[in-house]
Swiss-Prot record:
Protein name per Swiss-Prot or TrEMBL: Probable aspartate/prephenate aminotransferase
GO biological process entries: amino acid metabolic process; biosynthetic process
Record bears the keyword ATP-binding: no
Main localization of the protein described in the UniProt heading: cytoplasm
Assembly information from the UniProt record: Homodimer.
Compartment annotation: Cytoplasm
Cofactor (UniProt): pyridoxal 5'-phosphate
Pfam families: Aminotran_1_2 (PF00155)
Task performed by this protein: Catalyzes the reversible conversion of aspartate and 2-oxoglutarate to glutamate and oxaloacetate. Can also transaminate prephenate in the presence of glutamate.
Site (Important for prephenate aminotransferase activity): K12
GO cellular component, one term: cytoplasm
Family: Belongs to the class-I pyridoxal-phosphate-dependent aminotransferase family.
Length: 399
């Protein structure tokens, strides 16, 4: 009898973390690799946030807290939702967890039974399907390629709904594409969902504050307040405040759902880190001045990367509304032969080729459910980003 559970048969390690691991190994071996795989901002956590954390340590705020987050942080989250999204939540409709990933894991563990279906637009963030599977749910994939601007149409949504559908996932702006749903698109989705009262919606808003040009962010509960009881909104401090390592995410939904998720959390991690919670309060309540400047910085990087990669004849690029990724269509390169005689047949082959030939680490599109693409993160310095994109261009021209 194997010591490993059969549960592991339905899931796999995070492909993006695997790329990061391989990149670090090559760098350690002295290879000049430029890493465009990691999904985290390249700027440091702001000093005002770090100072509050230091003070909380010195003040001895280092013990257990409420499982679902301290009231002061939940109040800051409540205020944030009202101030920025015009949504009213009570404290018992909010949970704080060890990162947004745990919020989503708790959500599915608390709500899914065997056979319950979760509609996941493709491409998707790598962890969605596996967390659904771990929770005994069934992922239902809906292809939303570049021809659909990487967004779910109401026709595709309606076609995917069955009597087993329990959740629809909306991630806007999206990882891996940066595509964002505008107000009208969300209104159309809400109009469709009103016909299906048993379908709940998880809105993953983690990239809310990283948007470009004239794109205006909306979240579904803001657009459709009549659906609020069926909407669970996920957010956190990781991306907007560059606090990926602090591990604070939060969610808001019905009291019954939050209570169930708190029970799940009480038997896994208990409370989020006490020090990180204090830092998150400062992130939400303190100055927000750097958020806009950081978004403008990412926009410049997006434009730089696009200006170079759009020159590659094999590529088709989508201009993202937010986040810090490009999801580039590259299937025209499939079937070509490298100098060593290897055939590039899929996105894994192409990513391996870029790593070997260009010394640039990217993530193959198949990791996000859609072969024929690759993802780059432009959350790096302008100099390194330009060099990486030029290397990719030259490697493609060499084929």
């Amino acid at each position: 009898m194997s010591i490993i559970s059969t549960r592991l048969n339905s899931i796999k390690p995070s492909p993006t973390l695997a790329v990061v691991k391989k990149t670090l190994e090559l760098k350690k071996a002295g290879v000049n690799i430029i890493a465009l795989g990691a999904g985290e901002p390249d700027f440091d956590t702001p000093d005002n946030i770090k100072e509050v954390a230091i003070t909380s340590i010195k003040d001895g705020f280092t013990k257990y807290t409420n499982v679902d987050g301290i009231p002061l942080l939940k109040q800051a989250i409540k205020n944030k939702f009202k101030r920025e999204n015009n949504i009213d939540y009570e404290l018992d409709e909010i949970i704080v967890s060890t990162g947004g990933k745990q919020v989503i894991y708790n959500l599915f563990m608390a709500s899914l039974d065997k056979g319950d279906e979760v509609i996941i637009p493709v491409p998707y963030w790598v962890s969605y399907p596996d967390m659904v599977a771990l929770s005994t749910g069934t992922p239902v994939f809906v292809n939303c390629g570049i021809e659909n601007n990487f967004k779910l149409s109401v026709e595709a949504l309606e076609h995917s709904i069955t009597d087993k559908t329990k959740w629809l996932i909306i991630n806007s702006p999206s990882n891996p594409t940066g595509a964002g749903y505008n107000c009208k698109e969300l209104e159309n989705i809400a109009k469709t969902l009103r016909k299906y009262p048993n379908v709940n919606i998880m809105s993953d808003d983690i990239y809310e504050h990283i948007t470009f040009d004239d794109f205006k962010f909306y979240t579904l509960a803001q657009i459709a307040p009549d659906l609020k009881e069926r909407i669970f909104t996920v957010n956190g401090v990781s991306k907007a405040y560059s606090m990926t390592g602090w591990r604070i995410g939060y969610g808001a939904g019905s009291k019954a759902l939050i209570k169930a998720m708190t029970i799940i959390q009480s038997q896994s991690t208990s409370n989020p880190c006490s020090i990180s919670q204090m830092a998150a309060i400062e992130a939400l309540n303190g100055t927000q001045d750097y958020i806009k400047s950081n978004a403008l910085n990412f926009q410049k990087k997006r434009d730089l990367a696009l200006s170079i990669l759009e020159e590659v004849t094999y590529f088709e690029c989508y201009k993202p509304e937010g986040a810090f990724y490009l999801f580039v269509k590259c299937d025209k390169i499939f079937g070509t032969k490298t100098k060593s005689g290897r055939i590039i047949a899929n996105s894994n082959n192409f990513s391996e080729y870029l790593l070997e030939e260009a010394k640039v680490a990217v993530v193959p599109g198949i990791a996000f459910g859609l072969d024929g693409y690759f993802r780059i993160s432009y959350a790096t310095s302008m100099q390194e980003l330009e060099e990486a994109c030029i290397r990719i261009k030259h490697a493609c021209n060499a084929l």
